[in-house]
Amino acid sequence: MAGAKEIKTKIASVKNTQKITSAMEMVAASKMRRAQERMAASRPYAESMRKVIGHVAQGSLEYKHPYLEVREAKRVGYIVVATDRGLCGGLNVNLFKKVLLDLKNWKEQGAEVEFCPIGARSVQFFKSFGGTMPAHASGLGDAPSIADLIGTVRVMLKAYNEGKLDRLFIVFNKFVNTMTQAPVIEQLLPLPKSEEVANKHPWDYIYEPDPKVLLDTLLVRYIESQVYQGVVENIASEQAARMVAMKAATDNAGELINDLQLVYNKARQAAITQELSEIVSGASAV
């Protein structure tokens, strides 16, 4: 059994760690609330854009934009949104597992794959994994703007426009609630037709003055808004996962302190018993 002094030092060390994890839990909770506010503010715009684009994809247009045309999938691109920092449980691991599973299906069909990682952990993972990375972004912070993402997104759009990509997906952790964050893969290009719209009478549009100019601007703005929403959702998911992970670490530290305190008490008791035995033995010898 370790000595009482050694155990006491270990208890002090665990208590210091517990203070750190408790502080990180509170910081994550505060950041999560702010991230939720940003997510709630941008979600209606992203969903409205998705609805409008769903109608556009379903409608019969005189001008057929390249983003509406489905072509054979020979090259597939993934925009993978992960975190810049760790200590958020299995959030990134679960996301990467989902990407690799989907990637396996495309490779079995003979498709080539490119990655556009967003977030330091995503960049690090795909550098070690291998594969083509035409663009990446990291260090966006807790409150990125859409301007921080435009350059990265447009590299992937340019590749699609030039025929270097036939499919483009975004992968991120969708914030469901504080305890649940679900990794999702959403198709960006070609524009997916809305199932909801398919079951209803589709809208018809009259474009003024020129459908090409309008759609070129609208569809690029749509892609940018969906990527931005994915990043915002992932940040909220990151802070929620970190808060839960730090709470678990704090609780575990408390249990460890209690266990060590019991060991310390037993060590103290054994030391006192030994001292008393030595005193009694000495007195008997005299």
Swiss-Prot record:
It is found in: Cell inner membrane. It holds the Pfam family ATP-synt. The keyword Nucleotide-binding does not apply. It is a peripheral membrane protein. GO terms for molecular function: ATP binding; proton-transporting ATP synthase activity, rotational mechanism. The keyword Cell membrane applies. Keywords: ATP synthesis, Cell inner membrane, Cell membrane, CF(1), Hydrogen ion transport, Ion transport, Membrane, Transport. GO terms for biological process: proton motive force-driven plasma membrane ATP synthesis. One of its GO terms (cellular component) is plasma membrane. F-type ATPases have 2 components, CF(1) - the catalytic core - and CF(0) - the membrane proton channel. CF(1) has five subunits: alpha(3), beta(3), gamma(1), delta(1), epsilon(1). CF(0) has three main subunits: a, b and c. Produces ATP from ADP in the presence of a proton gradient across the membrane. The gamma chain is believed to be important in regulating ATPase activity and the flow of protons through the CF(0) complex. PANTHER family: ATP SYNTHASE GAMMA CHAIN (PTHR11693), ATP SYNTHASE SUBUNIT GAMMA, MITOCHONDRIAL (PTHR11693:SF22). NCBIfam families: ATPsyn_F1gamma, PRK05621.1-1. Belongs to the ATPase gamma chain family. This is ATP synthase gamma chain. It comes from Shewanella sp. (strain W3-18-1).
